[in-house]
From Swiss-Prot:
Cited PANTHER family: POLYNUCLEOTIDYL TRANSFERASE, RIBONUCLEASE H-LIKE SUPERFAMILY PROTEIN (PTHR33317:SF4)
Protein name per UniProt: Putative pre-16S rRNA nuclease
EC number: 3.1.-.-
GO cellular component: cytosol
Single GO BP term: rRNA 5'-end processing
InterPro entries the record matches: RNaseH-like_sf, YqgF, YqgF/RNaseH-like_dom, YqgF/RNaseH-like_dom_sf
Keywords from the UniProt entry: Cytoplasm, Hydrolase, Nuclease, Ribosome biogenesis
GO molecular function (one): nuclease activity
Family: Belongs to the YqgF nuclease family.
Domain of life: Bacteria
SUPFAM superfamilies, per database record: Ribonuclease H-like
Pfam families the record matches: RuvX
NCBIfam families linked: RNAse_H_YqgF (TIGR00250)
Amino acid sequence: MTQSIIAFDIGSKTIGLAYSSGVIASSLDTIRFEEYNFDQGLKQLELYLKKYNPSIIVVGYPKNMNNTIGERAEMVDYVIEMFLDMYKSFNKDQIIKVDERRTTKIAKNILIQANLTREKQKKYKDSLAAQLILELYLESRKL
């Protein structure tokens, strides 16, 4: 049975998006908004939620390198709470946090290796990071 999954890579000005039907992760898009205006960013998710009707939302969780919870992870927790308040059809059990350490750096390196311009790197970095986060989740289910 296929399962619709969307992944978020949440930043202060962007939300990178990726999708999977349970097997292969694909980058979707990057939502852009004014810095820390998460309400503006979350409202833009509605189109993707209607189109893909996910049963699971995988969220990149930016722990510190020493495995502690820092400012960025607290920001992600805050955005998750806003998401659940805005989209009542979802509950906290459908939100899965995945350790995202180094995914943005890996995404940047992949885009550099692909010889993309800085402009294109900036355009695709967040959705590629979301794809990597989703791939980590899919791999963890195989274990």
